[in-house]
Amino acid sequence: MEYWDIYDAEKRPTGRTMKRNDWCLKDGEYHLTVLGVVARPDGTYLITKRVMTKAWAPGWWEVSGGAAQAGESSEEAVRREVREETGLDISNAEGGYVFTYKRENPGEGDNYFVDVYRFVLDIDESELKLQTEETDGYMFATKEEIENFAKEGIFLHYDSIKRVFEQLQ
């Protein structure tokens, strides 16, 4: 069973945990998620396509990410998520934390912080090992291609993270 730490509105750990996807959070309580934008030096971005069996946003494009596990730092979580979903070790990549945004869903028990990271890494495609339970393909996309996926409504979280793509230019 996976557990997540519970944070207060200032992103301070409360010392309490919740079961994964339990959605028991009160207003003013949050869990922590991470997103890792991975770029090549040529300015293209590694994006993955969600499997069609996902309950939410199947077939959409996204960057690697997920929830931080109890006791895990944000940085540890993003490194784990990128490794699990793509097989890439970003430990020695350039970059790091960029910004945090907060998502509140009053009365739904699902409030969360999202720490957004950006890494630049010279990626050899043979190094990619996609997590088949999560991903159904990948591409190295330009900023314009990602913007077009977003306009089509098939790129997850774009409005919340678009500035991380703009900052790489």
Residue ranges and their predicted role:
Residues 14-15, 96-98:
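Local beta-strand/beta-hairpin segments that build beta-sheet-rich folds
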Residues 46-47, 63-96:
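The catalytic Nudix box helix
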Residues 33-65:
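A glycine-rich, hydrophobic loop/mini-helix early in the fold
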Residues 22-25, 54-57, 138:
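A short local loop/turn or secondary-structure capping micro-motif enriched for an aromatic residue
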Residues 1-35, 41:
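Acidic, metal-coordinating catalytic segment for phosphate/diphosphate chemistry
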